[in-house]
Amino acid sequence: KIMLSEKVFAYNIGNGELLWQHDGAGIPNISLAIADGRVFFLKDDVEDEEREQARAAVQAEIDGGNYVPEREQKLSEKERDVRRVVCLEAESGREIWNRPYDLTGCGGTKLGVAYEDGRLLFFGHYSNHDEGPFNKGNLNWRRITVLQSESGSLLWSKPLNYRRRPTIVGDTIYIEPRRCDLATGEIQKRTHPITGESVDWEFL
């Protein structure tokens, strides 16, 4: 089971003084990311009206080409995983922005957050070896969603067939056994050493 919290807080490590605290419901411990003087995390306190707004926002992104839909789009509203994405100022705890977002397919109870170069990644913390389902292409529902950290607006969201939790190195996301571009989510290619064809970059 996922570990959930009801507060995010900061202490002065020099004297133990509580600097600030932010209350919330259903904050996954694995959703916290700190970078560039900001704290990012998820909350599970979205109202019905906000769920509708999040669904409409996804449809607009689908129409705009930034969100690649998959079978999770056929789920009912109650089955969809809509969370509140929150950005705080690390020094003061002041809220900079928050927005409800449909993160269906990004991991559910295993949903984690990472930061790199002004981008927030949402993905599943999977740590199993699903070679059989992977080889059959049955892990496509494992989605990665990337938001701009400054505003929370969507950069891209795609269902990617990956086995384990992604790792970011520079401008590349390693999604076992492939890798994709951090800025676009496009699977990177290489030249096959024997055939000379352009194929997906893969490792065993």
Spans of features found by a protein language model:
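Secretory-pathway ectodomains
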Residues: 1-204
